[in-house]
Every structure is written in C-alpha cells, then in structure tokens.
Amino acid sequence: MDIVKVCPELHIVMDVDSGLIAEMRKDILVVDLHPVEDEINKLAQYAKALENSLDPRNSPMKAYNGREGTYKLAGMFQGMFFGFWVTMAILVLVTILAVKMNLSLIGL
C-alpha cells in the first residue's frame, strides 16, 4: 500500500491503489502487509508440499521432472532393508538357541 503526500502542510495524502484522498492522522499507523502476505504464500506452498509428500505417487517439491513415485520406491527399499536386518537378527538368535540346546551340533 503506497501513499503520496498531496499537501504536506495540510497533512493530506492519497492512496495510490484506490485513489482515495484523505487527511493523514498521527494516531493511525499504516503498515504494508505485502511482505507478510508473500511469507504466508511461501508457507502455504511448503505446507502443500508436506501434504503431497504423504502420498507416495507425488514427487518431492524441488525434484526434477519424471520423479513421480520416489517416495514409493524409497518406502519399498526401506522395508526391504529393515526386513533383511530383522530377519538376520532372528536367524542369529535361533542359531544361538539351537547351539545352546544341543551342543553336539558344534562337536562338543
């Protein structure tokens, strides 16, 4: 919101956006909210990107074209990775338990 002082001696100003001419008062503070609105729009864009990241079919916000399904692929590999290590831990525990129960398996 821009204002122009039409007559500084009489404290008369004009609003550039609306063309309204009015008396300038000292008890009213005029604040430009365009920077705040820009920040709110940026936060809304980030919120939309976060919401889209919950759907594995969407691509990340600043990804190159053709990156749809990145989250789906990452989720699949994450499940395979942790599944492998959990299976290996269970296998080691079963092996240790089997050896403890029957020591003849290792020749003792």
From Swiss-Prot:
Keyword Cell membrane: yes
Entry-linked Pfam families: MtrB (PF05440)
Subcellular location: Cell membrane
InterPro entries, A to Z: MtrB_MeTrfase (IPR008690)
GO cellular component, one term: plasma membrane
Gene Ontology MF: a single term: tetrahydromethanopterin S-methyltransferase activity
Highest taxon of source: Archaea
Main localization, broad class: membrane
EC number: 7.2.1.4
A Gene Ontology biological process term: methanogenesis, from carbon dioxide
Catalytic activity of the protein: 5-methyl-5,6,7,8-tetrahydromethanopterin + coenzyme M + 2 Na(+)(in) = 5,6,7,8-tetrahydromethanopterin + methyl-coenzyme M + 2 Na(+)(out)
Bilayer topology term: Single-pass membrane protein
Listed transmembrane segments: 79-99
Assembly description: The complex is composed of 8 subunits; MtrA, MtrB, MtrC, MtrD, MtrE, MtrF, MtrG and MtrH.
Function according to Swiss-Prot or TrEMBL: Part of a complex that catalyzes the formation of methyl-coenzyme M and tetrahydromethanopterin from coenzyme M and methyl-tetrahydromethanopterin. This is an energy-conserving, sodium-ion translocating step.
NCBIfam families in UniProt: methano_MtrB (TIGR04166), PRK00965.1 (NF002129)
Family according to the record: Belongs to the MtrB family.
Name used for this protein in its record: Tetrahydromethanopterin S-methyltransferase subunit B
Protein species of origin: Methanococcus maripaludis (strain C7 / ATCC BAA-1331)
